[in-house]
């Protein structure tokens, strides 16, 4: 799907309805705390199939593939980093099976859980590569678009958007988490976030 096609999709459907609180619903369906969500879903595929079918029945136009923490850094916490391609590919296929042609499937990406230098040890270029690896697999798996969601760090958000744009030209949705003062955890207001995310560039 091109950006122009996505814009047409939005115009055609009016308010576009996304899916629901998948993590919460998975835990209510029996997913234990502390397990790798991506792996658990693949071991219990019917749970996600039923959930996402209910989303579509309720009116969702876009569902998120259950690839939320499917990046190398997060998967490494469970010793699953070498299965990154397999896990992400199968999860996209599972969502596609659930919704058919009744909804779009978004490749879902989020934070790695590590801080960027100088607050942490992870370099910006390394983070772009981490996201680029996942984005490449998701694009190859056939997602219709990407969502970079629940981000608290503008820099990490920029890295994800840069990575996706270097891999493909699919549409990208971005969501950040804001505190009651209207700023992210790192103090960034929405207006500044929009400026930096709209045209992100590598800091050469």
Locate the predicted segments by residue:
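Distinct, well-ordered alpha-helical segments
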Residues: 118-119, 153-167, 183-194
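Conserved, mostly hydrophobic/aromatic
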Residues: 20, 55, 95, 138, ...
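Glycine-rich, proline-tolerant flexible connector loops at the mouths of alpha/beta enzymes
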Residues: 35-44, 56-87, 143-158
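Single conserved hydrophobic/aromatic residue that forms the stacking wall/gate
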Residues: 195-204
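Alpha-helix-loop-beta-strand connector modules within alpha/beta enzyme cores
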Residues: 77-103, 158-175
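Short, acidic/polar
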Residues: 47-54, 122-137, 186-194
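N-terminal small/glycine-rich loop or linker at the start of catalytic domains
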Residues: 6-43, 68-75, 101-126, 170-183
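Catalytic beta/alpha-barrel core
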Residues: 127, 144-153, 185, 198
């Amino acid at each position: 799907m091109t950006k122009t096609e996505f814009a047409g999709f939005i115009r055609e459907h009016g308010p576009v309805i996304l899916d629901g609180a998948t993590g919460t619903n998975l835990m209510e369906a029996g997913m234990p705390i502390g397990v790798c969500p991506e792996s658990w879903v693949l071991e219990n595929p019917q749970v996600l199939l039923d959930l996402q079918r209910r989303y579509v029945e309720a009116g969702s136009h876009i569902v998120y593939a259950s690839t939320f923490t499917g990046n190398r850094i997060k998967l490494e916490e469970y010793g699953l980093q070498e299965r990154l391609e397999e896990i992400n590919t199968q999860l996209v296929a599972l969502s596609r099976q659930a919704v058919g042609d009744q909804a779009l499937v978004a490749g879902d990406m989020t934070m790695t859980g590590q801080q960027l230098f100088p607050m942490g040890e992870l370099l910006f270029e390394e983070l772009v590569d981490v996201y680029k690896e996942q984005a490449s697999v998701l694009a190859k798996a056939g997602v219709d678009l990407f969502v970079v969601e629940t981000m608290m760090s503008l820099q990490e958000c920029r890295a994800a958007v840069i990575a996706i744009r270097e891999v493909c030209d699919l549409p990208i949705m971005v969501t950040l988490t804001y505190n009651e003062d209207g700023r992210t955890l790192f103090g960034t207001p929405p207006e500044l976030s929009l400026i930096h995310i709209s045209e992100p560039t590598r800091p050469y």
